[in-house]
Amino acid sequence: IRPLLPQRADTVVGPGDDCAVVRVAGSADDWLFTTDPVIERRHFLPETPPRLVGRKAIARAVSDVAAMGGTPLWILVDLVAPAATPLARIRGLYAGLIAAAEKWNLGILGGDTAEGDTLELHITGVGRLPRGSAVLRSGARAGNFVYVTGALGGAYLPGSRHHLLFEPRLEAGRFLAQHKFATAMMDLSDGLAADLPRLLDASRRG
C-alpha cells in the first residue's frame, strides 16, 4: 500500500513508522498522527471486560506516540458494533475510554459510529513533540545496542492481562528523544521477535 500513497511537502514522515510526522509552517512543534484498530477475536475476546477493551484501544495509540518521543494530546474514537450489542457493553467500552483519556490527559474530540458484524474500536491519536526531535524506526546504525524499557513476554503468561493493562512508555520515550540517547525507537506491541525485523528493515540493516 505504501508506494501507492502520495506525500505532501508538509509530511516529514509518512506511512511506515509508529506515527506520521507533519510540520506546520511557523510552529515550533511537529505533529504526530496515528491510528489503531482493536477488533473482537483479534485483539480481545468476547468475554474481555469492556472497560479493559476501551483502555487497551487508547493505550495502543498512546504507545505509538511514546515510541516517537512525543506527547499525546487528542483522540478520535470510531465504534463499529453489531445491532444486538447490549447497551451496557457499549457503556463499559466508553467508561474505559474515558478513564484512559483522563489517565493520559487526552481530549476526546469525537468520532463516529457504524453497525457491523464485529465489535471494533478504531482510535486516531494526535500528539506533538519539539520540531525535528522525532526518533524514527529508520535510525538504527551498525554497532548499536538493542534495549527495551520493560519486561518481555508478559502477554504470553497463562491468565495474563498484560496486553490489556500495559503501560505506554511516555516518560522513557520523551527522555530518550530529548537527550538523543536513542538512534531509533519503535513500539513493541507485536513483540520483539516480530518488531525488531521491522526496525532493521526500516533502517536498511536487516
Where are the language model's segments positioned?
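Helix-biased detector of long, well-ordered alpha-helical tracts
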Residues: 1-206
